[in-house]
UniProtKB/Swiss-Prot annotation:
SUPFAM superfamilies: PLP-dependent transferases (SSF53383). Pfam families: Aminotran_1_2 (PF00155). Homodimer. It is an enzyme of class 2 (transferase). Its EC number is 2.6.1.9. This is Histidinol-phosphate aminotransferase. It catalyses: L-histidinol phosphate + 2-oxoglutarate = 3-(imidazol-4-yl)-2-oxopropyl phosphate + L-glutamate. Its cofactor is pyridoxal 5'-phosphate. The modification N6-(pyridoxal phosphate)lysine is found at residue 211. Pathway: Amino-acid biosynthesis; L-histidine biosynthesis; L-histidine from 5-phospho-alpha-D-ribose 1-diphosphate: step 7/9. The gene is hisC. Transmembrane segments: none annotated. Belongs to the class-II pyridoxal-phosphate-dependent aminotransferase family. Histidinol-phosphate aminotransferase subfamily.
Length: 352
């Protein structure tokens, strides 16, 4: 008997999520994790470090409720959006009995979180234009307790049709929780489904401070949902989920003055995205630049592996999507500073 064989069988078979940091690389330009290219500057108060944190940091809850336009009863603060995903699976799915459903190509943590919890996964691939295949989803809802969709979708960058999300909510009513992952919604706020919360008690929305707020290192996310759903998740969440320093910085980030700064910087980044998309389109190595509503672009290359490897060797770290369903020869590029974007274009231009 070894330590490994003592572990649960599903954990022994688990392929862990390959985060951008885990994949490593000796980069000088990091455009593989959809992080904001520069760090904000906040000052830690240093108060109450000798005390355990609040179960839910009330000033952060109130500040995010104000920002999102919901009641504090609709907000649960989590350790990044990923904890929200895990919480929902652990709360609603019986291991080895219930399933989640998601639609690849999409964010990899839905599958990993389910597998870690011993919960089954069902997949219904997106259509050729990366939209929901509603008839097939409807045919696969048996034993499904949670449906995950991502809009803007990672890694494709496109928005899902709100009419399709509405249809999904209707066909799952009384059967399953629908989770809409809005990690990138600050780049297209008009596309949020937050106004649907009042009419659909089985809707949950994942949010984060990791993307437009430039606080990926903070690990602060949110679940937005109706009070009954929030109350159930609150039974499962760890007693002290958000460290005092994280709550301190999150509260500062959600002050009106900083929100205005985030919105201005977001416009600058969207300008960089537009420039990068146009510059990539004229390169002979690039076959297609997909439309994006997020802070990254998905491109299809003649030889994606060659482009990825050539830039990796130059210290420009992108995200290879070649093994992702329907994304052969594709690469995801985080939109960085204008200087970083220019270096990416010049480097791809030199690939033979």
């Amino acid at each position: 008997m070894t330590i490994t064989t003592l572990s649960r069988q599903n954990i022994q078979a688990l392929t862990p999520y390959q985060s951008a940091r885990k994949l490593g690389g000796n980069g000088t330009i990091w455009l593989n994790a959809n992080e904001y290219p520069t760090s904000p500057k906040f000052q830690l108060s240093g108060k109450d470090l000798n005390r355990y944190p609040e179960p839910q940091p009330q000033r952060v809850v109130q500040a995010y409720a104000n920002y999102a336009g919901v009641s504090t009863e609709n907000v649960l603060v989590t350790r990044g959006g990923d904890e929200g995903i895990e919480l929902i699976i652990h709360t609603f799915c019986e291991p080895k009995q219930d399933a989640i459903l998601f639609c690849p190509p999409t964010y990899g943590m839905y599958a990993v979180s389910a597998e870690t919890a011993g919960v089954l996964s069902k997949t219904v691939p997106l259509t050729d234009d990366f939209q929901l295949n509603l008839p097939e989803i409807k045919n696969h809802l048996n034993d499904v307790k949670v449906v995950f969709v991502c809009s803007p979708n990672n890694p494709t960058g496109n928005l899902l049709k709100q009419s399709d999300i509405l249809d999904l909510l209707q066909i799952t009513a009384g059967k399953a929780i629908v989770v809409v992952d809005e990690a990138y919604i600050e780049f297209c706020p008009e596309a949020s489904v937050i106004n649907l919360l009042k009419n659909y008690p089985h809707l949950a929305i994942i949010r984060t401070l990791s993307k437009a707020f430039a606080l990926a290192g903070l690990r602060c996310g949110f679940v937005l949902a109706n009070p009954e759903l929030i109350d159930i998740l609150s039974k499962v969440i760890a007693p002290y989920p958000i460290p005092v320093p994280s709550a301190d910085l999150a509260e500062q980030a959600l002050r009106p003055a900083n929100i205005a700064t985030v919105q201005a910087l977001t416009q600058e980044l969207l300008s960089n995205r537009q420039w990068l998309a146009k510059a990539l389109l004229v390169l002979h190595q690039v076959e297609k630049v997909y439309e994006s509503e997020a802070n990254y672009l998905l491109i299809k290359c003649q030889n994606g592996q060659a482009v990825f490897k050539a830039l990796w060797e130059q210290g420009i770290i992108l995200r290879d999507q070649n093994k992702t369903l329907h994304l052969q020869n594709c690469i995801r590029i985080t939109v960085g500073t204008r200087n970083e974007c220019e270096k990416v274009v010049e480097a791809i231009k030199e690939v033979k």
